[in-house]
Amino acid sequence: MKFAVNYSTPLKELIEQNEVKVDLLKCPEWDGLIQAARPWGSVYIHFDISLGNNRVDSLDFDLIRRLLDTTDTPYLNTHLANRLGVDSASELLATWKEDLDFLRGKLPGVRIIAENLPCHEFLPQLKLAADPDLISEMIKECDLGLLLDLSHAQISAALLDMDFKKY
């Protein structure tokens, strides 16, 4: 397991002062931020890619390939999302799988992981996407890695009225 932290100026200062050690500097797909982070450690790109919203066909695959090739990003991360109007677990699972198949077709050989998103009262479509059983089914059936965001899991467990450890 590696310890990744969002890159920022305060983090850079802590690294400079030898106050913290991190394995990876987490950056969005922004070239300026990536260049600023490079002198301070290995850069990991945390992509803004969601499965379940039918938008993977609009991704910039040239940018994705370039960033995977030029950074220390071992996996393409995705987020297990949903869109308004999808209330069926089987429909959402099918959409996740379709989006994943599309990504794999565009990026053959790239290892893909999926991250759990938190559900919120103001984003009701994410309640279904945050279901731990549905997430587990997707991970197992599609040979995906899991990027388990513990803060997202805590938020979802509370809103789903579940024990955090069982989530």
Please report, for each region that a protein language model flagged, where it lies by residue.
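Short, solvent-exposed loop/turn segments at secondary-structure junctions
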Residues: P10, G32, I49-L51, A81-R83, ...
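Active-site acidic/histidine proton-transfer and metal-coordination neighborhood
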Residues: V56-L146, I155
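N-terminal pre-domain/capping segments
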Residues: M1-L68
